[in-house]
Design a protein with these regions (language model features):
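N-terminal signal peptide c-region/cleavage motif recognized by signal peptidases
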Residues: 16-18
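Bacterial N-terminal signal peptides that target proteins for export
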Residues: 1-7
Length: 146
């Protein structure tokens, strides 16, 4: 039995696509139905190798890693204001994400790559109060989702 070139091409395309991981979308919003200056969703749990696409649904926002909430060995990143940013997360752990211009207003989110640690994460006490409050709420929603 002969396998056609087209069959081999289709099979390899399917295998390569499934090995790349999923793409998750996060909206960057000035106002949502619930609050102002938010990422929607504010918490994601993804697999290593998955990509998150940060979409500037409303203008004036970016997505950047939050110093102090980054797994050891992970690369920091910083997207441009008003630009869609895609970031692939390969190192397991908890990532804090911030909108740099709106950090003081609490525009932050968490991304858990892989399974959460059994110990509760320690968030930097130097963060603005609103940012710290929102991160703690996101951590609580993570606990409820278990």
């Amino acid at each position: 039995m002969r396998i056609s070139s087209l069959t081999l091409l289709l099979a390899s395309a399917i295998l390569c696509t499934s090995a790349l991981g999923q793409v998750h979308e996060v909206k960057m919003l000035t106002r949502s139905a619930h609050a102002g200056m938010v990422y929607e969703p504010d918490y994601l749990q993804i697999a290593p190798g998955d990509t998150v696409k940060f979409i500037p649904t409303q203008s004036g926002h970016n997505a950047a890693s939050l110093p102090g909430v980054l797994p050891e060995g992970a690369q920091a990143f910083k997207g441009q204001i008003n630009q869609e940013t895609e970031q692939t997360f390969t190192v397991p752990g908890l990532y804090g994400i911030q909108c740099i211009p709106h950090l003081a207003m609490g525009m932050v989110m968490l991304i858990q790559v892989g399974e959460p640690s059994a110990t509760a994460p320690v968030l930097p006490a130097t963060l603005p109060k609103r940012a710290l409050d929102r991160l703690n709420l996101a951590l609580q929603s993570r606990q409820v989702a278990k």
